[in-house]
Every structure is written in structure tokens, then in C-alpha cells.
Amino acid sequence: MASTNSFDVVSDFDRQEVVNTIDQALRDINTRYDLKDTKTTIELGENTITINTASDFTLDAVQTILVTKAVKRNLSPKLFDYGEAESASGGRVRQVITLRQGISKDDAKKITKMVKTDFKKVQASIQGDAVRISSKSKDDLQAVMQAVRDLDFPMPIQFTNYR
């Protein structure tokens, strides 16, 4: 029985968890004394979060709250790609946060190159925005998982479809 085992390396997030994170953050912002009267809004777009608040100080506080709530809901802080803070109407501050999803071609090439050079008995192939890793040995696959975790990528990495 020489069957091959495999798994996929992906960068994805649960949209419902992001919605829950934003709801919890808004609830926290509306009850905090220093942020209560700032009329802060957090809006979720297709792949973006828009924060509209009173000042740079409150923007930093809202970012901290958002990341804290995300971590409590098992979302990686690497999920958020912060854009520039820009001034909005009425002396307010707006910031657009892009939600990272999918592995870029360059990062996928880094993963496959690392696998092919460090692990001779393991195959890696790029499949869209995921990387499929396959081998006959489950131990080799677990070693590859640890090696990929040790590489520092700007996006959150998950392992799915483990067979």
C-alpha cells in the first residue's frame, strides 16, 4: 500500500468570523469611555474593512481593539493589510484595511522552491492560490508543515485537505 499523502497550503479566512470580530469591536468601542463619543464606524466591504473615526489617536485604539478581537476569534493579525490613514470630511480620519486572502505567485514559488531543495522525497505544485504538497511519508509532510510555519510570510497560512 504505497499511497501518497498530501495537504494544501492556503491563505484564507472565515468571513463570518471577521463579521463577528467587527461586531465585537464596535460593541467594545461604544462602551469604552474614551471612544464612546467619537462616532467611530467600522464597515466591512468585499475584501476590505473601512474605519472612520475622530482622530489618529482613536484610530490607533480602534486598530488595537480590532486586532485583539480578531486574535480571540482565532484570526491571524497578518490578515490585516493596513492602508494609509487619510483625512475624511469633518476633520475625521479614515483608513482602509485590506483583508489578505490567497497565496501570491511569488510566495507560492518560495514555498515550492524550499520544499524541492530541503525535502527530496516531497513534491510541491502550485494550484491557483494554493500549494499542494504530497509525499508517501506522513512524517515528511509534518516536517514540511513545520518548515512552512517557520518561514515568515506576510499573510496567514493554513493547512487544509490533509489526506
From Swiss-Prot:
This is Nucleotide-binding protein SYNPCC7002_A1983. It holds the Pfam family DUF520. Belongs to the YajQ family. Keywords: Nucleotide-binding. Transmembrane segments: none annotated. Nucleotide-binding protein. The lineage of its organism: Bacteria, Bacillati, Cyanobacteriota, Cyanophyceae, Oscillatoriophycideae. GO terms for molecular function: nucleotide binding. It comes from Picosynechococcus sp. (strain ATCC 27264 / PCC 7002 / PR-6) (Agmenellum quadruplicatum). GO terms for cellular component: cytosol.
